[in-house]
Amino acid sequence: MVLSRGETKKNSVRLTAKQEKKPQSTFQTLKQSLKLSNNKKLKQDSTQHSNDTNKSVKAKKNGTSSKKTGTQRKRISTQRFSLFTYGNVQVMNSFVPIHNDIPNSSCIRRNSQVSANNVTESSGVFFNDTQSQDSQNTIKLKPTSLMAKGPIEIYQICTGFDKLKENIAPFQKSSKASSHDGHVVNYLSIGRHGDIVHPVLPKLQITRLNGAGFKYFISFYNPERYWEIEFLPLISQSQSELENSVKAFENVISKICQFSHINEGATIGNNESLSDKFKLPPTSDIEPPNTEIINNDDDDDDDDDNYDDDDLNYLLDEEYEQGCTDNSFSVISNTCSNLNASFLYPSDPTDAVSISINEAFKNAIRRTAPVLNIPIAAPSIHSKQQNKRYSSYPFIDSPPYLQDRHRRFQRRSISGLGDL
């Protein structure tokens, strides 16, 4: 039994070998050939794709490396030149109030301010009323805050130059911009760590105030803003060294921006406006009101004093209140007419305050004066009312002896006393 089993195994192996040796059909051979060709094509495509990816990666690497080298070259071509340095400077931010009011109201306010400021002075100062956007019509220059204190530096940045010659001064290149393809920009740096950096353009205006130390005013496109730069002496520095450094500063800024001088006499007080530099000549459209004082004779002065006494007696004496009749109307009308005729703008600074106060008091009397239409033979009711105080009388509006325009103008003039 054992042998039979071994023989059967051998026979089965021989049969399988014979079956494999049998020739295959044409369909099977075609199928196998197609499989082999497809496998070869897939291998070739995969190899080509891998080669393409390797080439693209190499090209990208080469492009990034070239870009890096290009940026490095640009950085090398940009150079910084220091034109001026100084160690001790104080910078104040100044504000200039500009009024854009109606010309008449602005005249009144400014005249009141001038009269108040010049009470203790013998000469008065009058401002021009011309206002425009281009001109800087200022009243006072007020330093508001300290911006920086420390060193100052003016430097220049040159970009786009292939080769920079060392023997040419940097600020001379800016004057010949057409001879090269580069770009030149000047900057003003203030502070230890460059706290304030501002570009110095050719249209920037820098003005020196002569006679008040070493002060310079930088004006911007906003006419209400100024920078006041003051050069302070360093430790153990002589006056001549300070003057030399200031001259070097002026020499540099005169070549890169607009630089000018102005005298101290053109200003009003300390740290105040640059008056004549930013003024325009007066135009025919806007004219200030004529300020005159009529010198009356002694008789006119006595008459005015009598009118003032009458007004005061009319307010204070009770006996005069009891005996007031239609004659009071003539007194009030005469005072009103005289005041209306002599209502003028004072220009003398010594008498400006007193005259304005008297006029305001007279105007107040005119407004509060009652119009009493009481007959001579008054009944008992009126006699009781006459014994009362002045504040208890029933007031009646006075007739319109002045036009509305004059009333408005008088109210403005009285309100202007608040500035005094």
UniProtKB/Swiss-Prot annotation:
Family (UniProt): Belongs to the INP1 family.
Subcellular localization(s) per the UniProt record: Peroxisome membrane
Alphabetized, the UniProt keywords read: Membrane, Peroxisome, Phosphoprotein
Specify the species: Saccharomyces cerevisiae (strain YJM789)
Return the Acidic residues bias intervals.
Answer: 295-309
Which residues fall in a compositionally biased region of kind Low complexity? Answer: 30-39
Q: Give the signal peptide as a residue range, or say none if absent.
A: none
How is this protein positioned relative to the membrane? Peripheral membrane protein
GO terms classed as biological process: peroxisome inheritance
Q: Which residues cross the membrane?
A: none
Which residues lie in Basic and acidic residues bias regions? 1-10
| Annotated function | Required for peroxisome inheritance.
Q: Where is this region: Disordered?
A: 1-75, 273-309
Location of Phosphoserine modifications:
273
Annotated Polar residues bias: 45-56
Q: What is this protein called?
A: Inheritance of peroxisomes protein 1
Q: Name one GO cellular component term.
A: extrinsic component of intraperoxisomal membrane
Q: Which Pfam families match?
A: Inp1
Q: Does the keyword Calcium apply?
A: no
